[in-house]
């Protein structure tokens, strides 16, 4: 039952992120109003919709820098320099530099700036929430952000369908990325169940694999998590034994494909070939993001994105791009399991990272433009880095938070 008290609570929670928090929360609304479906060959066209998002990126960058300059805490600086985020920043700045050899200078420049703008916006938000309320508030704000995105995604989907199955798939990348946070953290409310339901019915093969692998997070949390995983594993193992491994995989992971094969990966194998060829042809790449639609459209692959962080890096920024993005992910794996992340939150964040990593390896994500899985995977990354920095360098604040 929604009442005035609950509305005020939500508003107060949103306010914890400051102006930057509101800018991120209204993005799904802006997307709902101004986004449009484009032909593949119109990926670089500038219309009223594109102008809105250009202004939005500029506003985000301006207010983020302003907030970071005014804040006395060094949390944001530590987050950007003492965590794997520094390699993402270097990767993105290299993307900006690629305007000098890009096949589309304007497209590369804007998309790289947009990535930098949104990343700094998230850093500013998490600085606000960590300094104000510590780990608990950071988790609560994250849940709010995910739910807001889901709600607006459903509203957008209602413009072209009322099929409940299709509606449950509208925020598959956002919901599944934060599945383990909804499962493990905060008191179970309708919003937790909404995220869990959207994840279960997402019909995303990549997400299902990520969620399955993410179950190892249970071994880093409370004993009750391990019991749940044991029961789920027992049920799953029994089902596989009864149905048979081939039939099980065919009817789940490859449920909409003719056979189990790398060639049934909706064209990702062909995109991989394009990425390898791009490395041969241009070791420095074709320019951040611009190279992806330029090559993939010319190959008639029906995509403008590499659907894999490494493929995107290879096509856009060549060998240096692969090195930088690989270093970023390797260090993210290291800190996701770090002892500096408070034990009460470690399981949630390990599960969250594993799903986000799989999203980046199988969907549009980190390494390319702000699209598809980029926002959830980037927010998950900044969140995990925030917990790491908070636990390692802000022990006094952490002690107060635990009290």
Q: Which residue stretches match the model-derived regions?
A:
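N-terminal signal-anchor transmembrane segment
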Residues: 1-67, 95-101, 152, 356-361
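Interfacial loop-to-transmembrane-helix boundary motif in multi-pass membrane proteins
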Residues: 10-17, 79-92, 107, 112-116, ...
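Transmembrane alpha-helices of multi-pass inner-membrane enzymes
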Residues: 19-22, 346-359, 365-403
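Membrane-interface micro-motifs in multi-pass membrane enzymes
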Residues: 44-54, 110-112, 160-177, 204, ...
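Alpha-helical transmembrane segments of multi-pass inner-membrane proteins
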Residues: 59, 96, 117-160, 164-222, ...
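Hydrophobic transmembrane alpha-helices and their immediate junctions
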Residues: 72, 82-85, 317-357, 390-398
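A membrane-periplasm/extracellular boundary helix in multi-pass inner-membrane enzymes
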Residues: 219-260, 273-278
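Long extracytoplasmic/lumenal interhelical loops at the membrane interface
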Residues: 257-317
């Amino acid at each position: 039952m929604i009442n005035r008290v609950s509305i005020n609570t939500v508003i107060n929670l949103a306010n914890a992120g400051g102006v930057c928090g509101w800018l991120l929360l209204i993005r799904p609304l802006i997307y709902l109003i101004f986004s449009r479906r484009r032909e593949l060959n119109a990926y670089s066209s500038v219309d009223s919709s594109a102008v809105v998002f250009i202004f939005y990126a500029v506003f985000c960058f301006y207010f983020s820098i302003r907030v970071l300059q005014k804040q006395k805490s060094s949390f944001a600086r530590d987050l950007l320099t003492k965590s794997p985020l520094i390699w993402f920043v270097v990767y993105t700045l290299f993307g900006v530099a690629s305007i000098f050899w890009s096949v589309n200078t304007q497209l590369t420049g804007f998309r790289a700036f947009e990535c930098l703008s949104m990343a700094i916006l998230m850093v500013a938000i998490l600085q606000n929430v960590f300094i104000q309320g510590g780990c608990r508030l950071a988790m609560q704000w994250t849940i709010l952000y995910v739910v807001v995105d889901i709600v607006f995604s459903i509203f957008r989907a209602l413009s072209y369908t009322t099929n409940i199955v299709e509606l449950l798939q509208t925020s598959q990348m956002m919901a599944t990325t934060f599945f383990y946070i909804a499962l493990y953290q905060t008191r179970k409310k309708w919003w937790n169940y909404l995220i869990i339901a959207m994840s279960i019915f997402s019909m995303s093969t990549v997400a299902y694999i990520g969620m399955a692998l993410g179950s190892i997070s249970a071994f880093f949390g409370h004993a009750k998590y391990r019991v749940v995983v044991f029961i789920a594993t027992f049920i799953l193992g029994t089902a596989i034994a009864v149905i048979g491994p081939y039939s099980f995989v065919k009817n789940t992971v490859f449920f909409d494909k003719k056979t189990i094969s790398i060639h049934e990966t909706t064209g990702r194998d062909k995109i991989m070939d394009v990425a390898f060829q791009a490395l041969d042809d241009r070791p420095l790449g074709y320019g951040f993001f611009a190279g992806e639609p330029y090559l993939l459209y010319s190959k008639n692959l029906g995509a403008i994105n590499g659907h894999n962080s490494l493929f995107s890096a290879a096509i856009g920024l060549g060998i240096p791009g692969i090195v930088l993005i690989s270093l970023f992910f390797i260090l993210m794996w290291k800190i996701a399991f770090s002892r500096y992340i408070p034990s009460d939150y470690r399981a949630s964040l390990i599960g969250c990272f594993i799903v986000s990593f799989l999203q980046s390896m199988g969907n549009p994500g980190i390494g390319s433009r702000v699209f598809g899985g980029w926002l959830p995977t980037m927010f998950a990354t900044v969140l995990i880095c925030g917990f790491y920095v908070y636990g390692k360098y802000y022990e006094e604040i952490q002690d107060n938070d635990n009290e």
